[in-house]
């Protein structure tokens, strides 16, 4: 069966690795666009693709377009105006992977439908390694028939794939996933930081955490990095602040108090203010350990 031609809009760390994965599997990567032209050109040379100068070029060259942009404003921008992705988009499919507000996903779906195109929101609960290996955890919202049509493609980049309902539900679930993850990360940083201040053996403390109710997935992924101050970026503090903010806005709209999430967002925004926003989220430990820059 012929594989669809694929376009990419937004080829930062995650987008680029998804593109590489699909290229490895023989999908034609037809066109690549990024706000930073050099980023698009570099990946296009690597994959033998067109480095598109405009968004309509991506649409024209591709059957399916993945968008992996940074925030609400970027997502709105690529679907708005006469020279957007929706120019000549009839029959095309957009798979929107960014963590953005659910209302933005819904607006993109409405605009695409009016242009004769289809959309899915494919929210990712994974990081760079999983994107490159094709083992993403994907929560997909959108029309069930469109999901079924694109399921073989989505399976090629994921190890866990589920359809979660309407397009906005994917964004809501992803916001809550990241809300809880960020709270766990900030809480772990406080626990380990307090342990350091109390003069405890942090290796022993971390082992005790792992064997008790203090255990978490974040302890496995970030605990050693917090101790070693190794904060190479897989998921940045700036993105953590953004995503906690999305969840907090949803909570406000629902009339639900989420004080822990607000405190967590404040910690990550403090990192940004201190110039630490591009550290990995584990870098929140720089605010909680004694004798570290942000403590």
What is each stretch, according to the model?
Residues 215-281, 288:
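Interdomain hinge/lid region at the active-site interface
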Residues 1-68, 92-93, 97-98:
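NAD(P)+-binding Rossmann beta1-loop-alpha1 motif at the extreme N-terminus of oxidoreductases
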Residues 18-22, 108, 153, 194:
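Hydrophobic residues within alpha-helices
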């Amino acid at each position: 069966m012929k594989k669809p031609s694929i376009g990419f809009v937004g080829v930062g760390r995650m987008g680029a690795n998804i593109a590489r994965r699909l290229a490895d599997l023989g999908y034609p990567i037809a066109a690549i666009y990024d706000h930073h032209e050099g980023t698009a050109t570099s990946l296009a040379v690597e994959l033998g693709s067109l480095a598109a100068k405009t968004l309509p070029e991506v649409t024209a060259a591709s059957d399916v377009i993945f968008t992996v942009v940074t925030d609400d404003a970027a997502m709105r921008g690529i679907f708005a105006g006469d020279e957007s992705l929706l120019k000549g988009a009839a029959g095309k499919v957009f798979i929107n992977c960014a963590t953005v507000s659910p209302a933005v996903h819904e607006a993109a779906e409405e605009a695409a439908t009016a242009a004769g195109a289809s959309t899915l929101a494919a929210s990712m609960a994974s990081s760079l390694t999983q994107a490159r290996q094709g083992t993403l955890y994907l929560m997909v919202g959108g029309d069930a028939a469109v999901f079924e049509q694109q399921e073989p493609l989505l399976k090629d980049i994921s190890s866990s794939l589920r359809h979660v309902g309407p397009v906005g539900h994917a964004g809501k679930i992803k916001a809550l996933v990241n809300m809880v993850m960020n709270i766990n990360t900030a809480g772990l940083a406080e626990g380990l930081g307090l342990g350091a201040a109390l003069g405890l053996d942090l290796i022993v403390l971390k082992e005790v955490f792992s064997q008790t109710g203090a255990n978490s997935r974040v302890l496995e992924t970030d605990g050693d990095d917090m101790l070693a101050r190794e904060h190479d970026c897989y998921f940045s503090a700036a993105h953590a602040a953004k995503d906690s903010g999305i969840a907090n806005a949803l909570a406000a709209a629902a009339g639900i108090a989420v004080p822990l999430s607000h405190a967590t967002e404040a910690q990550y925004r403090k990192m940004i203010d201190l110039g630490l926003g591009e550290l990995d989220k584990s870098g929140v430990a720089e605010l909680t350990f004694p004798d570290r820059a942000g403590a």
